[in-house]
């Protein structure tokens, strides 16, 4: 809205030309979302406590996390509000990619909201069925990717990290591939959200990393120089990434150990889903394995645990899955686990950025 109000005035007031720049607006989208989440945080927590939206702790981690029972959850509503309001204020709202990104973010958030509401209403840790959750994710992701593929400037070619001119065209297979990326990322963040600050830290790192990739993909000069696919207009989504980073930092203000507020599925599913969609937008889908390495490790640990438990007749690889609970049961302090996972996330984001020159 600010963009559409001030840019037309730049012909009369030259200083307003600065609002044309994506980088400038991304920075202020970050700051706006940060202020919104920090200022509204206390009110949100009081409201959630008033309507009894407290966290229920599963039996397996009851002894470790019993002090967390009753902590306000569904804090993803606060984060989502900050992201969407900031994006609406600072982005070019004539850009289809911005609207698709917000659609994915809100859609996955709605699936998470229904799941959280079901848990709270039933006073248990089980929400909607896995099939219902997957169906909701497929509906949102399928709609967004379907609309994306219809855009003339978008291609179904796949960029492969470390290879300069190897871009296989997946054709109709691109749709299920993109759905796998988005839903996998969504569930990966959801599985990681088990300790104070654990999921939001790598989410901030991943959003920052993809802000670079999405900006480069939308800039024809940079895209050609770095040999990455150019998607005209997609650079505007950098503003959304800035808002996501800012809201994430504001949410971390209250989610840091000991957490005063949990994001719930409304936060984790929306963040993961939109990170996957941004990876699809800028044609860096495979790099999400590196950028979101923490989420990948957590997901793999669950798959390994469940698979081995079934084939071995009840034996386990880890003391508990996801992986962060394994370290908890080994006696590693929660704050140390979180900080170490953050460090790993930062290193993997830097590794992903380095692929821009390793080709």
Swiss-Prot record:
The record's subcellular location field reads:
Cell inner membrane
This protein is called Phospho-N-acetylmuramoyl-pentapeptide-transferase
Q: Which GO terms describe its molecular function?
A: metal ion binding; phospho-N-acetylmuramoyl-pentapeptide-transferase activity; UDP-N-acetylmuramoyl-L-alanyl-D-glutamyl-meso-2,6-diaminopimelyl-D-alanyl-D-alanine:undecaprenyl-phosphate transferase activity
Q: Is Transport given among the entry's keywords? A: no
PANTHER family per the UniProt record, alphabetical: PHOSPHO-N-ACETYLMURAMOYL-PENTAPEPTIDE-TRANSFERASE, PHOSPHO-N-ACETYLMURAMOYL-PENTAPEPTIDE-TRANSFERASE HOMOLOG
Per the record, the gene is mraY
Entry function = Catalyzes the initial step of the lipid cycle reactions in the biosynthesis of the cell wall peptidoglycan: transfers peptidoglycan precursor phospho-MurNAc-pentapeptide from UDP-MurNAc-pentapeptide onto the lipid carrier undecaprenyl phosphate, yielding undecaprenyl-pyrophosphoryl-MurNAc-pentapeptide, known as lipid I.
Reactions this protein catalyses? UDP-N-acetyl-alpha-D-muramoyl-L-alanyl-gamma-D-glutamyl-meso-2,6-diaminopimeloyl-D-alanyl-D-alanine + di-trans,octa-cis-undecaprenyl phosphate = di-trans,octa-cis-undecaprenyl diphospho-N-acetyl-alpha-D-muramoyl-L-alanyl-D-glutamyl-meso-2,6-diaminopimeloyl-D-alanyl-D-alanine + UMP
UniProt keyword annotations, A-Z:
Cell cycle, Cell division, Cell inner membrane, Cell membrane, Cell shape, Cell wall biogenesis/degradation, Magnesium, Membrane, Metal-binding, Peptidoglycan synthesis, Transferase, Transmembrane, Transmembrane helix
Q: Which residues cross the membrane?
A: 27-47, 73-93, 94-114, 134-154, 166-186, 197-217, 233-253, 261-281, 286-306, 336-356
Its membrane topology is listed as: Multi-pass membrane protein
A single GO BP annotation from the record? cell wall organization
> What EC identifiers does the entry list?
2.7.8.13
- 4Fe-4S keyword on record: no
Output the Gene Ontology cellular-component terms.
Answer: plasma membrane
Family statement: Belongs to the glycosyltransferase 4 family. MraY subfamily.
Superkingdom of the source? Answer: Bacteria
Instruction: State the pathway, as annotated in the record.
Output: Cell wall biogenesis; peptidoglycan biosynthesis
- Cofactor requirements of the protein: Mg(2+)
């Amino acid at each position: 809205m600010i963009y559409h109000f001030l840019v037309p005035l730049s012909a009369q007031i030259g200083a307003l030309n600065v609002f044309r720049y994506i980088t400038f607006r991304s920075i202020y989208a970050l700051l706006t979302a940060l202020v919104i989440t920090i200022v509204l945080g206390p009110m949100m927590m009081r409201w959630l406590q008033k309507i009894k939206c407290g966290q229920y702790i599963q039996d397996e981690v009851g002894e470790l996390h019993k002090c967390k029972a009753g902590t306000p959850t569904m804090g993803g509503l606060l984060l989502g509000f900050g992201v969407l309001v900031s994006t609406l204020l600072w982005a070019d709202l004539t850009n289809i990619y911005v609207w698709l990104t917000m659609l994915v973010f809100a859609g996955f958030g709605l699936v998470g909201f229904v799941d959280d509401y079901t848990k709270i209403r039933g006073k248990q840790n089980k929400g909607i069925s896995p099939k219902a959750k997957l169906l909701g994710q497929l509906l949102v992701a399928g709609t967004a990717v379907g609309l994306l593929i219809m855009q003339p400037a978008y291609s179904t070619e796949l960029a492969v990290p470390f290879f300069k001119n190897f871009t296989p065209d997946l054709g109709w297979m691109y749709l299920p591939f993109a759905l796998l990326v988005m839903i996998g990322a969504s569930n990966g963040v959801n599985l990681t959200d088990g300790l104070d600050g654990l999921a939001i830290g790598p989410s901030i790192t991943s959003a920052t990393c993809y802000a670079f990739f999405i900006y480069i993909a939308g800039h024809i000069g940079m895209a050609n120089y770095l040999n990455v696919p150019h998607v005209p207009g997609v650079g505007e989504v950098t503003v959304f990434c800035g808002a996501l980073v800012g809201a994430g930092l504001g949410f971390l203000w209250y989610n840091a150990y000991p957490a005063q507020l949990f994001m719930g599925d409304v936060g984790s599913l929306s963040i993961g889903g939109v990170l996957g969609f941004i990876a699809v937008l800028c044609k860096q889908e495979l790099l999400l394995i590196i950028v979101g390495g923490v989420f990948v490790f957590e997901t793999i640990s669950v798959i390994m645990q469940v698979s081995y438990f079934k084939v071995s007749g009840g034996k386990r690889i880890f003391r508990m899955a996801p992986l962060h609970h394994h370290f908890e049961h080994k006696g590693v302090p929660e704050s140390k686990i979180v900080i170490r996972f953050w460090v790993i996330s930062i290193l993997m984001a830097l590794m992903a950025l380095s692929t821009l020159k390793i080709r």
